[in-house]
Amino acid sequence: MLDDIPITIQKSKKIKTLSLNITPSLEVILKMPDSCPQARASAFLKEQEAWLKKTLLAMQEKYSLLHSRLNTYKDKILVFDEVKNANDYTLTDLKKILKTYLERKLPLIAQKMQTSYTHFSVRNNAKVLGSCSYHNRLSFALLLICAQKEAIDYVIIHELAHTIHKNHSQNFWRCVKTFCPNYRALREHLKQKVVFYTQLLKQLQP
């Protein structure tokens, strides 16, 4: 649809509006309703072309910096934001370390927030840093092991807030802010680091 940019198209009856996303791997995805005419989709892409090219360029520059930083971390890993020798750890080891931390912190923070959860798990290839199911089952991404403990605690608070508010309403964010006043800075920090952490973990054996 755009001559110089490959685009993956996802069509579904569940999709209600046209949207354009760029994944961390720089894949451009156009989501469109089944009923959307091709001409409308093409016009939408033309409208978004300038933004798309500018954003892709910025992300490519960011990736270039990322690769240069990864070179300085060859055979290194971060454990709670501390540099360690990657050869001393497997993914299983890191999972146990993060799980132990969560087993200690989750009940403490849940008690402070006057809420509860039914179960929690740590996932190796999670697409999100954390999630909370309708039945209050919590899930956390293994890559959080690389982050500072304060940032991990923010994710814990974020997911526990979902046991109270099943959305991202003003009440939800008010709840998060009550227990994590600097959540915005921590959220932005994690957003900037997530790809870096993911790449760091790729050098480890299961």
Which residues are covered by each model-predicted region?
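Active-site-proximal or metal-binding-adjacent scaffold patches in catalytic folds
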Residues: M1-Y154, T163-P206
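Walker B catalytic acidic pair
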Residues: E159
